[in-house]
A protein has these predicted regions:
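Ribokinase/PfkB-type carbohydrate-kinase core domain
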Residues: 1-278, 290
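Short amphipathic alpha-helical face segments that pack within enzyme cores
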Residues: 281-289
Length: 290
């Protein structure tokens, strides 16, 4: 990252300047039973419940030296990832942050016209804030990325556009709707536990390779609980592909959307040991293809 005096440094050298915002995360494995009084619930698939203590995330203070370094060294930055707006609740503050971000993106493009601006969606604490964010920043980004829960929430609950995330063709059409609605420049990435896919125009980068890297790093983290080492990623290569991912791959390949869709099945884990930070690992993996 970039220090306050503008140097590129390892994160170990950075000092904390704000109060920590601990997350309380309760993981549930597929088949677990939760008992509340006389009620009993069986977990249908591995997931987690996150209870967030809001501190600095509610304001998202920007480090100006970080943005300045990227703008001054844009030719060295092949992709520029935007995220972390999801805990903001004040629309005026969000507008201020987004306007700054749009100016930053414009400056980055001047220094690197081929650079990829990548926006990772999240679970927002306010629907109105999420709408403002997507509608403001969407046209400035090359790729908008989200998981299938966010695809479902955005189209079915926020905009009543309609998508069935259990149907891969509906999901492809949903990704196309996302791109159209927000004016995303190149395409949309959808990532799930069974597959990941890119829907949009052809890229100079090998996005299929990026999706593979993303899937492997996310699965390695699900299997080990931390960012996968080379040896741990090698272990994941021995896993088989899941039925849903393979079925979706074949369906897309035979569909009218085959030319504009790249789908990669994930290595299958029925009961992952960990379900935290998998999206972040996926996004990190994808960046390697740029």
């Amino acid at each position: 990252t970039v220090s306050q005096d503008g140097r590129l440094v390892h994160t170990d050298e950075i000092r904390q300047t704000n109060e920590q915002g601990p997350h309380f995360i309760i993981q549930f494995k597929k088949g677990d039973k939760i008992c509340l009084g006389a009620q009993e619930m069986v977990i249908p698939c591995s997931n987690r419940l996150i209870i967030t203590k809001i501190t600095v995330n509610e304001f998202v203070p920007f480090s100006k030296p970080y943005f300045r370094w990227i703008e001054q060294n844009a030719s060295l930055v092949s992709s520029n990832v935007l995220s972390s707006f999801n805990a903001l609740l004040n629309p005026e503050l969000l507008k201020e942050r987004l306007n700054f971000t749009k100016e930053h993106v414009a400056a980055y493009r001047v220094g690197n016209p081929e650079g990829i601006v990548f926006f990772e969606d999240a679970h927002f604490h306010s629907i109105d804030v999420k709408k403002l964010c997507l509608e403001t920043i969407g046209a400035s980004v090359d790729i908008l990325s989200m998981n299938e829960e966010e695809l479902n929430h955005t189209l079915n609950h926020m905009y009543q556009e309609g998508v069935d995330v259990e149907d891969i063709i509906s999901s492809v059409e949903g990704a196309k709707s996302i791109r159209r609605m927000f004016g995303v420049r190149k395409g949309v990435v959808i990532h799930t536990k069974d597959y990941s896919m890119y829907v949009g125009e052809p890229l100079k980068a090998d996005i299929e390779r990026g999706l593979i890297y993303g899937n492997l790093l996310a699965t390695a983290k699900a299997n080990n609980g931390w960012y996968g080492t080379k040896e741990q990623v090698k272990e994941v290569l021995e896993f088989g592909f899941g039925d849903r991912g393979m079925k979706n791959y074949q369906t897309v390949r035979e569909s009218k959307y085959a030319e504009e869709t790249v789908l990669v099945p994930s290595k299958y884990m029925d009961k992952p040991k960990f379900t935290i930070g998998l999206g972040d690992s996926f996004v990190g993996g994808v960046q390697m293809c740029f």
